[in-house]
Amino acid sequence: MASKRKSTTPCMVRTSQVVEQDVLEEADRAKDKGLGVPPSDVSKERWAAEPEPSSKESEVVEVRSVGESQSKKLQGGYECKYCPYSTQNLNEFTEHVDMQHPNVILNPLYVCAECNFTTKKYDSLSDHNSKFHPGETNFKLKLIKRNNQTVLEQSIEATNHVVSITASAPGSSDNDPGVSVGKTATVKTGKQKADAKKVPKKPDEAAPDNHMEGTARLVTDTAEILSRLGSVELLHDSLGHVMPSVQLPPNINLVPKVPVPLNTTKYNSALDTNATMINSFNKFPYPTQAELSWLTAASKHPEEHIRIWFATQRLKHGISWSPEEVEEARKKMFNGTIQSVPPTITVLPAQLTPTKVSQPILQTALPCQILGQPSLVLTQVTSGSTAVSCSPITLAVAGVTNHGQKRPLVTPQAAPEPKRPHIAQVPEPPPKVANTPLTPASDRKKTKLQIAHLKASFLQSQFPDDAEVYRLIEVTGLARSEIKKWFSDHRYRCQRGIVHITSESLAKDQMAITGTRHGRTYHVYPDFAAQKFKEKSQGQLKTLEDSFLKSSFPTQAEVERLRVETKLSRREIDSWFSERRKLRDSMEQAVLDSMGSGKKGSDVVAPNGALSRLDQLSGAQLAGPLPSPSSAVVQNQEQVHLLRSTFARTQWPTPQEYDQLAAKTGLVRTEIVRWFKENRCLLKTGTLSWLEQYQRHHLSDDHGHDVASRRATKHVAESPKNGSEVAHQYAKDPKALGEEESEKLVPRVKLVGDPSKDCLAGKPSEATSDRSEGSRDGQGSEENEESGIVDFVEVTVGEEDAISEKWGSWSQRVAEGTVERADSDSDSTPAEAGQA
């Protein structure tokens, strides 16, 4: 028989049988019957031979004739031992087992932890146990998942007996001092005990009474268990209203199914993995009629099935509330006043009657149900004292009465009348953020403070690690999925250019939040009478100035740090920063006035009605709810001034210059690059009216320092008369210029249209680099071309070809009055760059 199981059919083991197995007896039965799964007891054989529609949960193996199985194996392929399915494709067979039989393990690996013995066959493990562990009965099988491989690790219990909640196994007897429990506490009903009194004489007599006999056996076994737990110390603290926690554990396939004694044909096991049903049960275990109607439409299952499923879940988790308790718990839940209970273990024995259980068993609690980690063990020591070892979970063991009562009656000696003694609940931590509405995560809108925390973290890293996510969960009170979704959305928006999160915008958001909650927030350092600004010490002023140099809009953490160091109030710090920004604004305005600019940076509008992105950003920030709007304008004016000054010097900054601008302005590097690109495009259309002013200011600053170098580096100087006349003539009519006049332009040509522009020849090296940078953008000295004035052209010997092409392109642009990119720019750029 063993050779037949070595065919192409993979070895399959049900996980529900891994919990408790008497390995020796089951090995013998496996050899006798020739099945890949060890059977349980005599009653299971009888039920497998005559299956009933109402006992599907109790069926484990379907017995087939030997001839049928042999005929299928002769054809080749794979057959399922739990249903008539067969196929010749291994992938289809594996998919069938995973979908239809989730509790079946394919090709497990058996490991003996005592001897380091490893095998893939159950028969080999049985032979190993009979040879090396003769007479041993306390075997434990532990299920482990390793790299898509299911490992069943066998160990031997070192000592005495362990309290169990399973029905009597094949290897246990009535005189055992205890019943063994496995990795997961299970309640197996629907099985008859393998003694002569319980097994009926005829097969047809067993079918009608199997459920009632099994339930009676459940009650008697519970009485036996609770009688052995008499020495356990009872905890008299009554439990409060605690919501059930029905979250899917990672080992969902290992959780045993609870058989329903009543109406098993109506119980739909497909609802056990329905996320909608589980979420609804997590919210409240007693659904209203409206919720039942909604669940009926959402899950596409009959309402009667949903009612039975909810009743079964309450039965499974030991929940049985009176109507008054249901209303009270519902009010507390929606008022946000549910308090969690400390982890306790409560064993509450009750009076039991050995008679048969009446019909409404769904309204009573199971004898025992363990939630949380499935490694809780109650060990009964032979000395008489009972040691309780468990993980920090809440466990309640309540007796079951069979008088049709809604809640079990508890003896006064056991506990002083607890209101609801049969709740099994894992306490949840209290919510971090108070008054959180009980709405779906997608419907909740984030507050400004939550968005500020998220933006601050987004600036540090667009892909936060787990530690940062947990910190954001504690700070914002948002769920992990909400935080992940927010980061994903903003990464997409930043890549598309929809939003731009900068340090300045974050600082302004935090300032706005601080300003809105000043009147209702209590701080660690209360604000007393404000000091006068003149009374600040030198140390305080130095600390404030250092912070101002870093950022003119301090963050919340920076303000708290300044309060600790300077001993000033929050109002004083905010006022000082506001006054300091106003002082800086006035100085900036004075600089702009000295440059002859009567316009503000945010008011510069292009002739075609277009604004640069940075100007639009500054205009948008004007409308923000900031304490001092003028400070935001001047802050942007300072940034715009630095960018424009750099643009007047060179329109193609180097990477080092981009880094310097990012450090000086506080803007993101990508924003600066985009600003330069847009302004170069505007320069081609002739809409940069501010460029001439900034270039004049830049050249006037360089004029005083470069007079000597200008005289020293001047090689050939044409007279103003000749140079001016030839250049103006060439600008008016290039074709009329003869060869002699064009040769005069080769050594040195200087056109003077404005006496104040003589300083342009002051720094030849820098002027040449500026022209090379300008030629890359194809515009030359465009600010003067808009007014129709050409300041100068400096030419050295050896550049005749390049300069002639450049002069041709310039003359065409001057004549047409527009700024276009000439084809000769690509040729002139290398020549000028090499000369520079």
Curated annotation (Swiss-Prot):
Phosphoserine modification, residue list: 824, 826
Cross-link (Glycyl lysine isopeptide (Lys-Gly) (interchain with G-Cter in SUMO2)), chain numbering: 455
Stretch list, region Required for interaction with NFYA: 263-497
Alphabetized InterPro entries for the sequence: HD (IPR001356), Homeodomain-like_sf (IPR009057), ZHX_Znf_C2H2 (IPR041057), Znf_C2H2_sf (IPR036236), Znf_C2H2_type (IPR013087)
Record region (Required for nuclear localization): 317-446
Region (Required for homodimerization): 195-358
Domain of life: Eukaryota
Region (Interaction with EFNB1) residue spans: 27-77
Chain intervals with Basic and acidic residues compositional bias: 42-58, 192-210, 700-709, 730-746
DNA-binding region: 263-324, 439-501, 530-591, 628-690
Keyword terms of this UniProt record: Differentiation, DNA-binding, Homeobox, Isopeptide bond, Metal-binding, Neurogenesis, Nucleus, Phosphoprotein, Repeat, Repressor, Transcription, Transcription regulation, Ubl conjugation, Zinc, Zinc-finger
Sequence segments annotated as region (Required for repressor activity): 263-446
Gene Ontology molecular function, alphabetical: DNA binding; DNA-binding transcription factor activity, RNA polymerase II-specific; identical protein binding; protein heterodimerization activity; protein homodimerization activity; zinc ion binding
UniProt cross-references to SMART domains, sorted A to Z: HOX (SM00389), ZnF_C2H2 (SM00355)
Pfam families: Homeodomain (PF00046), zf_C2H2_ZHX (PF18387)
Example of a GO biological process term: negative regulation of neuron differentiation
Record region (Disordered): 24-58, 168-210, 404-442, 700-836
SUPFAM superfamilies assigned: beta-beta-alpha zinc fingers, Homeodomain-like
Entry's localization field: Nucleus
GO CC, any one term: nucleus
Residue ranges covered by zinc fingers (C2H2-type): 78-101, 110-133
Subunit composition and interactions: Homodimer (via homeobox domain 1). Heterodimer with ZHX1 (via homeobox domain 1). Heterodimer with ZHX3 (via homeobox domain 1). Heterodimerization with ZHX1 is not necessary for repressor activity. Interacts (via homeobox domain) with NFYA (via N-terminus). Interacts with EFNB1 intracellular domain peptide; the interaction enhances ZHX2 transcriptional repression activity.
Its job: Acts as a transcriptional repressor. Represses the promoter activity of the CDC25C gene stimulated by NFYA. May play a role in retinal development where it regulates the composition of bipolar cell populations, by promoting differentiation of bipolar OFF-type cells. In the brain, may promote maintenance and suppress differentiation of neural progenitor cells in the developing cortex.
Sequence similarity: Belongs to the ZHX family.
Protein name per its UniProtKB record: Zinc fingers and homeoboxes protein 2
Organism of this sequence: Rattus norvegicus (Rat)
